Curated annotation (Swiss-Prot):
Disulphide bridges, residue numbers: none
Other remarks on this protein: Present with 2140 molecules/cell in log phase SD medium.
The protein's name: Required for respiratory growth protein 8, mitochondrial
GO CC, alphabetical: matrix side of mitochondrial inner membrane; mitochondrion
Pfam families per UniProt: RRG8
The organism's place on the tree of life at top rank: Eukaryota
Amino acid sequence: MGLPKSAYKKLLIDCPTRVINKNCAQRVKDVSPLITNFEKWSDKRKKLYFKDEEEMVGQFHLENFNLKNNLYGRLLASPMRAEKISKLKSCRELLIPLKVVPSTGKDQHADKDKLKLVPTLDYSKSYKSSYVLNSASIVQDNLAAATSWFPISVLQTSTPKSLEVDSSTFITEYNANLHAFIKARLSVIPNVGPSSINRVLLICDKRKTPPIEIQVVSHGKGLPITQSVFNLGYLHEPTLEAIVSKDAVTNGIYLDADNDKDLIKHLYSTLLFHSVN
């Protein structure tokens, strides 16, 4: 038995407006996951970019920490890289870069079928690379598994027998390269003296002083400034000690943190490499 026409009319035409969703006609906007979930799938944190940061700082009276001219701020601002021992990410300037090169035999000829992983001082895009913690003690404790430090792309396309890491010279080679670079630069670089406001003082103190220290000293008209002190006596390297101690007037060598960035970075890496964990 069908419904009467009055019932159809009541259901289809005379439907109360209170049950109708007035917003049902509005189409939901399509939002790309590139925008909504970027930080999740890309493993990158959200960042804010401003057209004119200096103007914004002055307009809203914000405190400017001037990290661009800060030695440690520059180190921490380097790109994040995953290192092979702890499997965690860290700032690139706080790690040891490793490069993949063809292995050479006793006849000093390169063997195309074998690859060798060696430490280097600076990152370069010209070769495949990976990273490990910049610590002599940690590297020494994990040298037995050094073949796992190769880049993933190399591990996936090579056999274990074709990969080589010389564990007997790995630490000494990296240490020698660091010291050679520092000696060469310190031999020709000028001592700026305490005139530079943004400065690093190199000293040689074999007593139980920290390898790196931040001091507050007076400058100019008695205004307090901070300076970093790198104690190269911590390295027990006679050649470096002789270079640093040659100027008896200033009791060390002053470096300009703005003009000697590369040297200061490698000095920091050397002290970090030898620090006790």
